């Protein structure tokens, strides 16, 4: 992720589930990405470059996974489903949905039990490349962030 995604985006939230994952990112400014494209001496528009970075990340992960488990073949479908957060409520809903996803799928009973998402990175004091400050500022405090996530709300499939 550091090599491919972080140069073009800030990771806000993620959740890794056995058969899928969710990732909420904020892409860097067009100027920053254009400078990155120029520094790599490439001729590509910013949107294509961002998608190429994701493609490279998926391929890199698949190769490492296949090597580790002595297997061959693809891990991911040929498309990435994307949703754009249009409002502040969308961002809050996406973060909540992503962090509650393992509970929703019955993989754990409480968010804090799932180790494969960004929730624990937000509440931890350990160093992280996740945008922890974003969460604290967005929700007002770490306590407010935790309080929202303690809600026992059923998730609706919002085409995520």
Predicted segments, located by residue:
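Short catalytic/metal-binding and nucleic-acid-binding patches
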Residues: 1-160
